[in-house]
Regions:
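Amide-donor transfer/coupling interface in amidating biosynthetic enzymes
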Residues: 22, 26-30, 58-193
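Short, glycine/serine-rich, charged loops/turns that create anion-binding
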Residues: 41-43, 151-152
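A structural signal for short, well-ordered beta-strand segments and their strand-loop junctions
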Residues: 37-39, 146-147
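Flexible gly/pro-rich beta->alpha loop and the following alpha-helix that scaffold active-site loops
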Residues: 1-37, 43-54
Length: 193
């Protein structure tokens, strides 16, 4: 389990202390033709390994202020950032699920952008007490996105705790745009392997 030693620490150790895995991961992030998305445990892993920060500085996630596992439906504001995946969603507010015990961003003084913020700083709307209401970060080059909320759990309207009546004809929620944006970037950059 990736949380036994703390958020993603065991998983991170598998990369840090395995020379072959560490080299493969480092090479992946050095390439200019890659994208990555870390959701929840993936976000924790990216932060623990310093994959969002250009100087590879580790920024471990902290326990939620409530000191318990938080699971619920919240809203996030998608910020203006250089995120390839979120570029068409900038300045929108969308509902999304959270489910984590260590999802608090703190000590956010680094070389990255805040890509998503919880819509309110008050608990339970900011379920973990993250600094600056941060829900997700993106690397300066826009290609690597780390977020605690689960966008994969709100792709279909029926998955959402609330979906606007005026959009009841939607087959997919606006969150699908993150994956469409990624696909378009891959096509625009002629990435085939």
């Amino acid at each position: 389990n990736s949380d036994v030693l703390g958020s993603a620490k065991g998983w991170a150790g598998a990369f840090k202390y395995n020379q072959k895995a560490n080299k493969a991961l480092s090479n992946f992030y050095l390439r200019s033709d890659t994208l990555s998305l870390g959701v929840c445990n993936g976000c924790q892993l990216m932060m623990e390994l310093g994959l969002i920060e250009s100087n590879n500085k580790s920024i471990p996630m902290a326990h939620n202020n409530s000191q318990k596992f938080e699971s619920g439906y919240v809203t996030v504001n998608i910020q203006k950032s250089n995120s390839i995946m979120l570029k068409s969603l900038e300045n929108t507010q969308l509902g999304i699920f959270v489910a984590h015990g260590e999802g608090k961003f703190e000590n956010l003084n680094g070389d990255f952008d805040i890509a998503l913020k919880y819509s309110s700083g008050d608990y339970p709307f900011n379920p973990n007490g993250s600094e600056k209401n941060t829900a997700g970060l993106v690397s300066k080059n826009g290609r690597h996105l780390a977020m605690m909320p689960h966008l994969e759990r709100v792709i279909f309207p029926w998955q959402c705790a609330h979906y606007p009546n005026e959009r009841n004809e939607d087959e997919l929620t606006p969150w699908i745009e993150a994956f469409i944006n990624a696909l378009n970037w891959i096509k625009e950059n002629n990435i085939t392997n």
